[in-house]
A protein has these predicted regions:
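N-terminal/domain-start segments enriched in small and hydrophobic, helix-friendly residues
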Residues: 1, 5, 44, 51, ...
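An N-terminal domain-start capping segment
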Residues: 1-9, 61-67, 101, 109-110, ...
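Short, flexible, mixed-charge acidic loops at enzyme active sites
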Residues: 39-53, 104-117
Length: 234
């Protein structure tokens, strides 16, 4: 479905029609843009995205190609369909954050412990930084493509970044997130940008220093708690 603009647009539209929500979020998988970097992704039923050749070394990272939007032009076409009269509410485009994307690439698929991912972050910082740099470049290009196609807002999903502590985040992840958000905001200052994660209570005060318009909280958090930690973007 995600490669068929008409079908994907209909699925995106369904919650608006059925529940009357005040915005639509693009129906895609967070790993969808990896096709544009020549990464073979298998979406295994009951498991999720799986990679037959996990990334574990600098040589593996060197094989990652720069993001080519023409390889996922169906995503831009879906957005244009939706924002050219199909929707009467704003459309939120999105991408997976570099850490969350990296966790799938390094682990080879979904995991419950992120041991290999944190192992690279802590034990091979040069390899980690090279991977994050490439994924940050992808995020900028992918979000820009969605903005150009007509998305009304942009969200970054860092679903699994709660697996790292605050110091690890500041050292190995924050600089890349800052570059992504600052670059995209500079190009599209009119578009609101949001970010969310799971189990990230210990990170939201760090996120508050990023030029985000919205910080989304999961069920473990409260707006009161976030405000007490200096977060004003909720």
């Amino acid at each position: 479905i995600t490669k068929e603009p008409e079908l994907c647009a209909r699925v995106t539209e369904l919650p608006v029609k059925e529940y009357g929500v005040d915005a639509a979020i693009l129906y895609k998988d967070i790993m969808s843009p990896m096709v544009a970097m020549n990464v073979n992704v298998e979406l295994k039923a009951g498991v999720g995205p799986v990679f037959s050749t996990p990334i574990r070394s600098m040589a593996d990272i060197d094989k990652l190609e720069a993001f080519d939007p023409t390889k996922v032009d169906y995503i831009a076409k879906t957005i244009t369909l939706l924002t050219s009269g199909m929707l009467d509410v704003p459309l939120i485009g999105f991408c997976g954050a570099p850490f969350t994307i990296a966790s799938y690439l390094i682990e080879g698929g979904p995991t419950k412990n992120y041991n290999k991912t944190r192992g690279m972050l802590i034990g091979a910082p040069d390899v980690w930084d090279a991977l994050m740099t490439k994924l940050a470049d992808m995020s900028i290009a992918y979000l820009s493509m969605q903005a150009e196609a007509g998305a009304n807002a942009l969200q970054i999903f860092d679903s699994w970044v709660g697996a790292v502590n605050a110091d690890q985040y500041k050292q190995g992840i924050y600089p890349h997130m800052e570059r992504i958000i600052k670059t995209v905001k500079a190009k599209y200052p009119h578009l609101p940008m949001a970010m969310n994660g799971v189990g990230t209570d210990h990170l939201v005060s760090i996120w508050s220093h990023l030029p985000l318009d919205v910080i989304a909280l999961d069920w473990r958090s409260s707006i009161v708690m976030a405000n007490e930690r200096g977060v004003t973007q909720t």
